[in-house]
Amino acid sequence: MIKLHILEIATGLEAHAVRYAAEHWGISVTVTWVGNSQQIVDCLSSYPDCDLILISGHGDERGLILPELAEEVSSNYPYRDVISHDDFAKFLNLNNSVVINSSCMGGVQSMAEVFLDKGAKCYIAPKDFPLADASLMYLLKFLYEYVKNNKDIDKAHDLALPQDERELFTLFK
């Protein structure tokens, strides 16, 4: 059985929609409802035992945006506002997982290189700011083609890409 782990970082219903669809298609799904940066570090530094990892979050040119915490709380965690590609390089330890990062700007070359260098089988993310609906539709179509229809990663990506009319999701290998 294919295993998917979702890191949900304040994205509303995206993670719920992906989880329900994935479970319907026979994927074993676990979710971390991220409240602080240590949870991301713990998950992605521990050689996760899953075939697919979905980082369901928000991003910008700085990197993955973290949940806003009060100063007295955020000082207890390794990263505050954002986790950059340089930060990810310090703790990632992946287990040949397919990593999909739905956060805006997650598909910049420097971020992709870090994930690949640290053990991702491949890395998929948008290179700019996709519309939220397009992002969700890409995720659902990719999972459907990859898991349910047994397409290889390249073919599943090619079939899912038109769901985002601006075709911002990029596959890095």
Q: Regions from the language model: what does each represent?
A:
Residues 1-52, 102, 114:
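A domain-level signal for caspase-like cysteine endopeptidase catalytic cores
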Residues 13, 61-62, 132:
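Flexible, glycine-rich phosphate/dinucleotide-binding loops
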Residues 19-22, 66-70, 114-117, 138-140:
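Short, glycine/charged-enriched secondary-structure capping and boundary segments
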Residues 21-26, 44, 92, 146, ...:
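Hydrophobic, Leu/Ile/Phe/Ala-enriched alpha-helical segments that form helix-helix packing faces
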Residues 23-27, 50-53, 72-75, 118-122, ...:
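Short, low-complexity, polar/charged sequence segments that are solvent-exposed and flexible
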Residues 31, 55-58, 78-80, 123-128, ...:
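Glycine-rich loops and low-complexity Gly/Arg-rich segments
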Residues 32-105, 109:
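Catalytic-core segments of thiol-dependent peptidases
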Residues 98-173:
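Active-site-proximal C-terminal subdomain of hydrolase catalytic domains
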